[in-house]
């Protein structure tokens, strides 16, 4: 990416990663355009105004599907995140344990992959986060 121009959404995690200079995989010689409207990023890429965009992979995939365009997505993600579910600190019903058990069962029996498969190609790759937060 050295010498290239990358568009990111303003106030998003990709913007933070590119502007902070803390990720050794990203050369310092990258021009970053912070764009408020995510849809403008795709137009800028399609028109050649930027060399790349950094955004959530699922958003890029959905844009490509909806607009019948093809972009190349890098194999290595810029960032892997997990989602959390919050319960009231004083909740004594054990909902957190129950939910963890149900999610574990859904993962084991393939239900999670089946649900993700309705929305994403290669759904199994989105379940490869066992060590996240470890």
Residue ranges and their predicted role:
Residues 1, 44-46, 85, 99:
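Hydrophobic residues within well-ordered alpha-helices
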Residues 1-37, 57-59:
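Bilobed "Venus flytrap"/periplasmic-binding protein-like clamshell domains
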Residues 8-12, 35-39, 54-55, 89-97, ...:
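Soluble non-cytosolic domains of exported or imported proteins
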Residues 14-15, 65-119, 122-134:
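Periplasmic-binding protein-like
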Residues 17-21, 44-79:
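A ligand-binding cleft/hinge motif common to bilobed small-molecule-binding domains
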Residues 27-29, 37-40, 50, 71:
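Exported/periplasmic ABC-transporter solute-binding proteins
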Residues 31-43, 79-81:
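Short helix-initiation/N-cap motifs at beta->coil->alpha
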């Amino acid at each position: 990416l050295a010498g290239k121009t990358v568009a990111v959404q303003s106030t998003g995690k990709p913007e933070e990663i590119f502007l902070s200079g803390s990720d050794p995989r990203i050369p310092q010689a990258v021009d970053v355009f912070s764009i408020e409207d995510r849809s403008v990023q795709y137009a800028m890429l399609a028109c050649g105004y930027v060399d790349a965009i950094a955004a959530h992979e699922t958003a890029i995939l959905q844009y490509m599907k909806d607009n019948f365009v093809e972009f190349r997505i890098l194999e290595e993600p810029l960032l892997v995140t997990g989602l959390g579910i919050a319960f009231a600190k004083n909740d004594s019903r054990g909902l957190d344990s129950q939910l963890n058990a149900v999610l574990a069962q859904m993962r084991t029996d393939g239900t999670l992959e089946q649900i993700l498969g309705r929305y994403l190609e290669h759904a199994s790759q989105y379940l490869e986060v066992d060590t996240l937060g470890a």
